[in-house]
């Protein structure tokens, strides 16, 4: 039994399945942890989600910003843009069932025995592990609720970038969503920056990568995340594991087997990725 970590598949189904074959992933005994952004930009979002749905308890998923966008588009809250490649998914007779399954996925996975954490963008350096767990549960509860569309209408907000215990309920949810699915950089006081996507090679003070900020969590846990293809594995100290290698941008999909630390990769093949 092995555990594999991957992120940002982005509808690149062909590359994903080849990578699973390369790694000898066994869907009867192995486990797959995916750090979000299953869909969008690549041509086969529907096939990716259908396959993961078929794995049932063999897959552990945290949602990324593009997964949330798909749910919002399906609910009629956001426009279906051409670059999403969502048409096939939205027209599928399975779309409602698959969307409902996605809505019940997590924003944070924690394995206390192995001291492993996974989220899409990362973990706010302003949180300790207990606050992070509570905040994840709060947004998971809203997204899985029957009135999830109302939640999604209110959740997008760029100005909620600083954590305080006295945040009102809605702003608390907004901050949590920004932290788990959107942040890359922080300011020295801990405020999140959701806009800069560049490699740290090209970014100067006052911005710092979130994983270089002081944090009680990284002293205890190995942290797996995606969302940031321009990192290219550089500038990232242990115990952080960046998983987004930019497959949908014409680069590669990567996967780590936890037990022996072996990395697997598959170069971009799809012709419709953007």
From Swiss-Prot:
Which SUPFAM superfamilies does this UniProt record tie to the protein?
A: Metallo-dependent phosphatases
Q: What GO molecular functions are on record for this protein?
A: bis(5'-nucleosyl)-tetraphosphatase (symmetrical) activity
The record's listing under InterPro entries reads:
ApaH, Calcineurin-like_PHP_ApaH, Metallo-depent_PP-like
Entries under Gene3D superfamilies matching the protein: 3.60.21.10
Per UniProt, which keywords does this protein have?
A: Hydrolase
Q: Which reaction does it catalyse?
A: P(1),P(4)-bis(5'-adenosyl) tetraphosphate + H2O = 2 ADP + 2 H(+)
- For whether the record's keyword set contains Hydrolase, the answer is yes
Entry EC no(s) = 3.6.1.41
**Its job:** Hydrolyzes diadenosine 5',5'''-P1,P4-tetraphosphate to yield ADP.
HAMAP family attached here? Answer: ApaH
Q: Which family does it belong to?
A: Belongs to the Ap4A hydrolase family.
Q: What is this protein called?
A: Bis(5'-nucleosyl)-tetraphosphatase, symmetrical
Q: Which organism is it from?
A: Buchnera aphidicola subsp. Acyrthosiphon pisum (strain Tuc7)
- The record's gene field reads apaH
């Amino acid at each position: 039994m092995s555990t594999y970590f991957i992120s940002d598949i982005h509808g690149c189904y062909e590359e994903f399945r080849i990578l699973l074959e390369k790694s000898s992933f066994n869907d009867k005994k192995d486990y797959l942890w995916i750090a979000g952004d299953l869909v969008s930009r690549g041509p086969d979002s529907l096939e990716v989600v259908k396959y993961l749905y078929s794995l049932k308890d063999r897959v552990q998923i945290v949602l990324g910003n593009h997964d949330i966008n798909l749910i919002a588009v399906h609910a009629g809250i956001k426009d279906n843009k051409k670059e999403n490649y969502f048409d096939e998914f939205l027209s599928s007779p399975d779309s409602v069932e698959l969307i409902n399954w996605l809505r019940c996925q997590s924003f944070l996975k924690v394995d206390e025995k192995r001291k492993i954490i996974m989220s899409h963008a990362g973990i706010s350096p302003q949180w300790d592990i207990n606050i992070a767990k509570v905040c994840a549960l709060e947004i998971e509860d809203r997204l899985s609720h029957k009135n999830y569309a109302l939640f999604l209408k209110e959740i997008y907000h760029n100005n909620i970038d600083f954590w305080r215990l006295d945040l009102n309920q809605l702003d608390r949810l907004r901050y949590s969503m920004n932290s788990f699915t959107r942040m890359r950089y922080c300011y020295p006081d801990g405020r999140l920056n959701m806009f800069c996507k560049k490699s740290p090679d090209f970014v100067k003070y006052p911005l710092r990568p979130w994983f270089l900020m002081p944090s009680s969590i990284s002293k205890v846990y190995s942290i797996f995340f995606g969302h940031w293809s321009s990192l290219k594995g550089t500038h990232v100290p242990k115990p952080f594991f960046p998983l987004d290698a930019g497959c949908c941008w014409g680069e590669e999909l990567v996967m780590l087997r936890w037990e022996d630390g072996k990395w697997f990769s598959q170069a971009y093949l799809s012709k419709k990725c953007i």
